[in-house]
């Protein structure tokens, strides 16, 4: 607008900016009630003097001015427009003054303020005239459009964005302005009245709420996210009609801002006033509205959002022509429509919101002096006091509620007290709604008391939990506080030196007791000097301290006194293990050499054998025999080199390797370190641990072993290393070359019997509580266990089976004795009874404030062992063994009593020891001159064994061609060779002579002796080569009923080393060539008959002549 230009006041009003005045909103507490501050702020806001601000609801639309304006003369209209323009210019400043919380008037330099005493007197006179005009108009009209008003304790509507103020409209205007009496004359404009809450509001916008209902007199902030509902609320605030109905969702998980169906909400809610509304942070359309409920209402009908929007489109033109009118703020005029057709929420029909027709609910009359009401009221007050003593927040809410709602006695307002009790409680949804719906005070008070009692229980539980937690941490905090005070006092008195100096002295004392080498001593002094100059808060301080701790933990120069007694060593080794002659002899040799030299050096031994033969346990026995400290660690599956040689000190949490840790634990330089499962060591991206063992297990290098963490040479030459492995194939060759191998073979039946009787059975009896009971496991039963249940090389499974037998026996004895032999209360010792009584007291004590100590609750109560009568006896024999361990797992190894042609018995070595391996050969098709030769091989044979079968087939054909040339069996025979137990993989070269013998037996049609077993590798020229596992194979042959065993001549030394108890009853035959095997197996063979055995089948049959007869001519 150009300077000096004047506009009509209606046009100027459109350009006036209408600032939004938000009210402060406190975060809603869990009780959903207002705090004292928000109530005081609302009262202060209502008491502030405010200037008049134009409301859009009090001005007619400019498209159709009221008839009063058309009758005014042009001069008067121009003067009035000028005055209204001034009023518009002052309105924003007046509103800013009204929002000022200080309540002071603006200074003289503010825009719109009077600049002289004359102007102020003129403004006052104008205000007086306007006030007198308003009083006269109200007397003439009699009935205003607004309602009759509510009690004085209800809050007045808050003017927002041009809403009406609570003061008269002409308070700060001049006498000639629009709000004065002169401007009122003949204008038809409606004067503004003091706002009040209408008692009758038949139609309101319904807002659904979740979780908790609203109660009259208690504020609650709600969040509106629906943009249409938010826009409708903003429009209501602008028009000065901030009234809504709040109704609770029946489903506590429901959400939304629009009611689609009346069945979704309860029909009883509250008529609430929006006291403040402001946009949500981070959202463009949502608002947060603060509601103040005034009274209870009930829904009579719902106008759904779709119908409301449709109705809004048809009534839009009518609303535009008629204008927007605030029923509770303005007086009616002659131009308005009849009162009975007027609806104050008609402007909301253009929004898709929920409109409901409601009716007020009035409380039923009650007698304040009723005994029931007084008693329940008194109980509610008492419960509130109890909750206030437990919850400080609740105490503040009670104080604010009492100050605002009860100027007099509490018993005078039982209805409000019941609403307060329900509003502050955290009850169930249906319980809270039931309190809201009850109009009978005598019924409402007990319901509210029940809800409040639940809140008291919650408060008591919270208080108890808080006290329990506080009791747990109070003692620790007190000790920490006292210790800190003590440290400070000692530091001030000089009694205690600095912790760093004390640490340095401790390291020096440790180092003086050790015989550190010069190189190590130098490093120690350097690190100790660095520690003395470091601050304790520095990160390097902890690293240096830990390093010095490890340096002083290694036993430099500390050795254990070794025992060189041969007899003592033999006694100790025989106590723990039966057999293992090779290992025991090697240890005795080690002791003898040390006794002759006066000192011993470290050795690296490697015990190789099947599982369960005692490799790991013999290491502990060796340490006890030599009086050395024992340390064991397994490298099976190890893939990190740092486990052997440690981590660099630069890493966080770095530690030395296992070897340095072993020295720290043993505290000697000459311990026995057992490295278990060395054949199963792994390899990963972090290095190859087997390569790291090369330095460790090399007698020439381990005198200066260098750990990555220690970074100083450590002497390991006096350490006795014992490694264990099942096989040597997976051990790297350089590492295997550094160790002295001692092979341990599996136990035979006699050795297992001795081990079971000497070690396993007594240990199992003690473990199962049968040490003092007469339970006898016969020798025949143990033999049956070994033969039919436990055929493995070791004795682990035998130990399990014997323990199983004794466990079954213990169960049988207790079951037969019955439960009355020793009563439960008599089974406890004196100590156990004391513990039981103490636990019962702690359990039954109602005043226990802390939970039971977990250590006491998990401690086993001492009990008296059951005394079995001496008359109880139990003998477990071979026949009754199945009752304890079930049916036998292994049957007899002997598959044939007599061998048919083509069947032979070989011998094999398995992880469970030796086993009989049968080879079967058959003729697939009948021999004819036209048949084609070939061989099929089955039995899950692996590569090496398949090659042996091919060699045996070729060698058998060679033997037949040389010794039986007329026997053309292999030229025409289609053969099938099979090894039984096809589910078991089979491999190895030692079945060569067995396969060749099977083929020759079939070709010669000659059965073999079933008491002869054989093993040996065969070459194509007939040479028999060396095999392994002769001990186990011999045991298997004896178990299968063999009387003779054929083995290679190169294994003669192994045969001679076998104990006599193994070779007893078996005749050994060493062979170097297969011809010796042939002569031994086919002694009674008729070579002439064998040469022609298949001649009939292979003979050419003569062709039949034709029946045609030649005729003579």
Curated annotation (Swiss-Prot):
Positions annotated as active site in the UniProt record: 990, 1033
Top-level taxonomic group: Eukaryota
Region (Disordered) location: 42-196, 828-864
Domain Lon N-terminal, residue spans: 204-456
PROSITE patterns tied to this protein: LON_N (PS51787), LON_PROTEOLYTIC (PS51786), LON_SER (PS01046)
GO cellular component, one term: mitochondrial matrix
Reaction equations catalysed: Hydrolysis of proteins in presence of ATP
Annotated positions binding ATP: 609-616
TM helices/strands, residue ranges: none
Basic and acidic residues composition-biased segments: 64-99, 124-143, 178-192, 828-858
CDD domains on file: RecA-like_Lon
Similarity comment: Belongs to the peptidase S16 family.
Subunit structure, as described in the record: Homohexamer or homoheptamer. Organized in a ring with a central cavity.
Protein's name according to its UniProt entry: Lon protease homolog, mitochondrial
Source species of the chain: Aspergillus niger (strain ATCC MYA-4892 / CBS 513.88 / FGSC A1513)
Taxon lineage: Eukaryota, Fungi, Dikarya, Ascomycota, Pezizomycotina
GN (gene name): pim1
């Amino acid at each position: 607008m150009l300077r000096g230009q004047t506009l009509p006041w209606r046009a100027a009003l459109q350009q006036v900016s209408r600032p939004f005045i938000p009210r402060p909103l406190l975060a809603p507490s869990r009780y959903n009630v207002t705090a004292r501050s928000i109530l005081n702020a609302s009262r202060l806001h209502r008491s502030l003097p405010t200037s008049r601000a134009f409301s859009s609801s009090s001005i007619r639309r400019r498209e159709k001015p009221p008839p009063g304006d058309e009758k005014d003369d042009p001069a008067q209209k121009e003067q009035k427009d000028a005055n209204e323009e001034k009023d518009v210019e002052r309105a924003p400043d007046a509103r800013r003054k009204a929002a000022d919380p200080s309540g002071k008037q603006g200074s003289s330099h503010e825009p719109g303020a009077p600049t002289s005493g004359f102007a102020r007197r003129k403004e006052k006179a104008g205000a007086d005239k306007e006030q007198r005009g308003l009083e006269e108009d109200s007397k003439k009209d009699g009935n205003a459009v607004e309602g009759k008003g509510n009690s004085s304790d209800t809050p007045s509507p808050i003017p927002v964005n041009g809403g009406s103020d609570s003061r008269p409209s002409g308070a700060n205007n001049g006498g000639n302005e629009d709000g004065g009496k002169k401007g009122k004359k003949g204008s038809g404009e409606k004067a503004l009245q003091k706002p009040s809450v209408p008692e009758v509001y038949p139609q309101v916008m319904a807002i659904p709420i979740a979780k908790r209902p609203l109660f009259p007199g208690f504020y609650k902030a709600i969040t509106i996210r629906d943009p249409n509902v938010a826009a409708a609320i903003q429009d209501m605030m602008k028009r000065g009609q901030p009234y809504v109905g709040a109704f609770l969702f029946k489903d506590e998980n429901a959400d939304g801002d629009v009611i689609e169906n009346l069945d979704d909400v309860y029909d009883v809610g509250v008529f609430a006033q929006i006291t403040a509304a402001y946009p949500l942070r981070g959202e463009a359309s949502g608002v947060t509205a603060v509601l103040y409920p005034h009274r209870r209402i009930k829904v009579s009908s719902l106008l759904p959002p779709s119908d409301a929007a449709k109705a809004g489109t048809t009534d839009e033109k009518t609303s535009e022509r008629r204008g927007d009118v605030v029923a509770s703020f303005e007086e009616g005029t002659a131009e308005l429509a009849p009162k009975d057709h007027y609806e104050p929420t008609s402007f909301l029909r253009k929004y898709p919101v929920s409109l409901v027709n409601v009716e007020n609910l009035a409380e039923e009359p009650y007698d304040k002096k009723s005994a029931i009401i007084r008693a329940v009221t008194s109980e509610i007050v008492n419960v509130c006091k109890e909750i206030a003593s437990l919850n400080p927040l609740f105490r503040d809410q009670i104080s604010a509620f009492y100050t605002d709602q009860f100027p007099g006695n509490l018993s005078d307002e039982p209805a409000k007290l019941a609403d307060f009790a329900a509003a502050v409680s955290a009850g169930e949804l249906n319980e809270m709604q039931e309190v809201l719906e009850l109009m009978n005070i005598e019924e409402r008070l007990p319901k509210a008391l029940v809800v409040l009692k639940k809140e008291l229980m919650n408060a008591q539980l919270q208080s108890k939990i808080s006290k329990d937690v506080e009791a747990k941490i109070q003692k620790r905090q007190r000790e920490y506080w006292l210790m800190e005070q003590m440290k400070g006092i000692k530091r001030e008195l000089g009694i205690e030196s600095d912790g760093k100096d004390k640490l340095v002295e401790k390291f020096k004392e440790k180092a003086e007791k050790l015989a550190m080498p010069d190189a190590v001593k130098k490093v120690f002094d350097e690190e100790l000097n660095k520690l003395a100059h470091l601050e304790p808060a520095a990160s390097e301080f902890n690293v240096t301290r830990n390093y010095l701790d490890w340096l002083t933990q290694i036993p430099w120069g500390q050795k254990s006194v070794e025992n060189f007694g041969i007899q003592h060593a033999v006694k100790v080794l025989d106590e723990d293990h039966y057999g293992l002659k090779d290992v025991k002899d090697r240890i005795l040799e080690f002791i003898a050499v040390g006794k002759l030299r006066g000192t011993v050096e470290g050795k690296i031994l490697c015990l190789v054998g099947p599982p369960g033969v005692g490799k790991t346990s013999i290491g502990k026995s060796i340490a006890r025999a030599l009086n050395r400290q024992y340390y064991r660690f397994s490298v099976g599956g190890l893939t990190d080199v740092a486990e052997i040689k440690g981590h660099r000190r630069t890493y966080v949490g770095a530690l030395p390797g296992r070897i340095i840790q072993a020295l720290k634990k043993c505290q000697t330089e000459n311990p026995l370190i057992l490295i278990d499962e060395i054949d199963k060591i792994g390899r990963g991206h972090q290095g190859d641990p087997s390569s790291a063992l090369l330095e460790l297990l090399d007698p020439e290098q381990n005198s200066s072993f260098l750990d990555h963490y220690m970074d100083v040479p450590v002497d390991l030459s006096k350490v006795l290393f014992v490694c264990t492995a099942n096989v040597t194939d997976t051990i790297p060759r350089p590492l295997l070359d550094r160790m002295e191998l001692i092979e341990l073979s599996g136990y035979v039946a006699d050795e297992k019997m001795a081990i079971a009787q000497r070690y396993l059975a007594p240990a199992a009896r003690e473990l199962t509580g049968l040490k003092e009971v007469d339970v006898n496991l016969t020798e025949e039963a143990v033999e049956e266990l070994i033969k039919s249940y436990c055929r493995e090389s070791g004795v682990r499974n035998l130990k399990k089976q014997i323990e199983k037998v004794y466990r079954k026996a213990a169960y049988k004895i207790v079951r037969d004795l019955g439960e009355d032999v020793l009563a439960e209360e008599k089974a406890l010792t004196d100590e156990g009874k004391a513990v039981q009584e103490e636990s019962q007291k702690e359990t039954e004590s109602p005043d226990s404030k802390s939970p039971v100590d977990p250590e006491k609750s998990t401690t086993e109560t001492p009990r008296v062992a059951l005394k079995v009568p001496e008359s109880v006896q139990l003998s477990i024999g071979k026949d009754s063994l199945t009752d304890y361990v079930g049916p036998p797992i292994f049957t007899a190894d002997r598959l044939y009593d007599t061998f048919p042609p083509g069947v032979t018995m070989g011998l094999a070595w398995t992880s469970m020891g030796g086993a009989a391996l049968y080879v079967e050969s058959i003729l697939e098709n009948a021999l004819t001159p036209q048949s084609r030769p070939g061989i099929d091989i089955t039995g899950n044979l692996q590569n090496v064994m398949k090659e042996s079968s091919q060699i045996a087939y070729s060698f058998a054909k060679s033997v037949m061609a040389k010794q039986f040339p007329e026997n053309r069996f292999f030229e025409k025979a289609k053969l099938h060779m099979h090894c039984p137990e096809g589910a078991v993989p089979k491999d190895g070269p030692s079945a060569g002579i067995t396969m060749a013998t099977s083929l020759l037996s079939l070709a010669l049609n000659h059965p073999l002796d079933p008491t002869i077993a054989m093993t040996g590798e065969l070459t194509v020229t007939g040479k028999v080569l060396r095999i392994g596992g002769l001990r186990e194979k011999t045991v298997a042959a004896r178990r299968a009923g063999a009387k003779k065993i054929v083995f290679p001549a190169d294994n003669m030394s192994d045969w001679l080393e076998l104990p006599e108890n193994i070779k007893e009853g078996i005749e050994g035959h060493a062979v170097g060539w297969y011809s010796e095997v042939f002569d031994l197996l086919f002694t009674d063979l008729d070579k002439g008959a064998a040469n022609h055995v298949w001649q009939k089948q292979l003979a050419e049959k003569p062709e039949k002549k034709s029946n045609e007869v030649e005729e003579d001519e």
